[in-house]
Amino acid sequence: MDIKAYFELIRLKNCLTASFGAFIGGLIASYFNISMIDNLILASIVVFLVCGFGNALNDIYDLKIDKINKPKRPIPSKRISLGEARIFSYLLVVMGLIISMFNITCFLMAVLNSIVLQQYASTYKKNKIVGNLIVAYLTGSVFIFGGIAVGNIDVTIMLFLCALFAMWSREIIKDYEDIEGDIKEKVISIPIKCGEKSIYIAAFLLVFAVLLSPLPYLFGFFGIYYLISVIFCDLLFLIGIYNLVMNPSKKEAKKASRNIKIVTNLVLIAFLIGSLFK
């Protein structure tokens, strides 16, 4: 068995990042209550396994395209057979769902996200108008999952919403970068439908995320340290998207996409600061 090939199949780095997101979400929601560590570890394992299932499914459904565009991926390179990939993906999701039974709400959300991942891989990868929203939802949902695991989703819902709208904006900007390739692949996307106007849609979504970001302070969940930290992040968001609106080039779109990814991680740190120094 080529272990490295299986790690490539599930995109190990992505799985670890998602798993870490659930762990951090739970830490924030529990205000660093160490007695919840068992639940946090279980939640992180579930997210790792379900994320791996989704990534493996993507490669299964993309086999024809990957034979041309990514021939070194595990399945087209025949390091893993199509049948082995299917069995492995089923094992991942079954193990993830079994472990998620430590909390009935976690189990229900794991089932929901597994279905969403399957639908995304099979149906919505070429319809990015829907697919972008799915990716944004899945990105943000790991924080709620961590909150569910520790029995408190109040703060993580706000983190989820900020992440959802920021990532939704980023996905549209990425599609703007890739518009020529998507036209060739007959993909449906907002930039293909709207052209440069799609930048304004992305800007609106990002500004909405910025407007949501002070809510944990306004509702009294976090204190002034959070507010100062998140305002700094918001300024970085706004500068990046302003530059793109003023100069809607592919080069500027790439910068804006990278900026959103980096600043979203900084927002996560702001939430950690808020949880630590309430």
Swiss-Prot record:
**Can you tell me where the transmembrane regions are?**
12-32, 34-54, 91-111, 142-162, 204-224, 226-246, 257-277
Reaction(s) catalysed by this chain's protein = sn-3-O-(geranylgeranyl)glycerol 1-phosphate + (2E,6E,10E)-geranylgeranyl diphosphate = 2,3-bis-O-(geranylgeranyl)-sn-glycerol 1-phosphate + diphosphate
Q: Give an example GO molecular function.
A: geranylgeranylglycerol-phosphate geranylgeranyltransferase activity
Enzyme class at the top of the EC tree: transferase
Q: What is its main location?
A: membrane
Q: What InterPro entries has UniProt attached to this entry?
A: DGGGP_synth, Prenyltransferase_related, UbiA_prenyltransferase, UbiA_sf
Q: How does it sit in the membrane?
A: Multi-pass membrane protein
CDD domains under this entry? PT_UbiA_DGGGPS
Q: Which key words are in the record?
A: Cell membrane, Lipid biosynthesis, Lipid metabolism, Magnesium, Membrane, Phospholipid biosynthesis, Phospholipid metabolism, Transferase, Transmembrane, Transmembrane helix
Entry's localization field: Cell membrane
Keyword Disulfide bond set for record:
no
A Gene Ontology biological process annotation? Answer: glycerophospholipid biosynthetic process
One Gene Ontology cellular component annotation held by this UniProt entry: plasma membrane
Report any Pfam family annotated for this entry. Answer: UbiA
Q: What is its EC number?
A: 2.5.1.42
Does the keyword Kinase belong to this entry?
no
Which cofactors does this gene product need? Mg(2+)
Pathway involvement? Answer: Membrane lipid metabolism; glycerophospholipid metabolism
Describe the family membership recorded for this protein in Swiss-Prot or TrEMBL: Belongs to the UbiA prenyltransferase family. DGGGP synthase subfamily.
PANTHER family xrefs? CHLOROPHYLL SYNTHASE, CHLOROPHYLL SYNTHASE, CHLOROPLASTIC
What is the documented function of this protein? Prenyltransferase that catalyzes the transfer of the geranylgeranyl moiety of geranylgeranyl diphosphate (GGPP) to the C2 hydroxyl of (S)-3-O-geranylgeranylglyceryl phosphate (GGGP). This reaction is the second ether-bond-formation step in the biosynthesis of archaeal membrane lipids.
Task: Indicate what this protein is called per its UniProt record.
Answer: Digeranylgeranylglyceryl phosphate synthase
Look up and give the organism this protein is from.
Methanococcus maripaludis (strain C6 / ATCC BAA-1332)
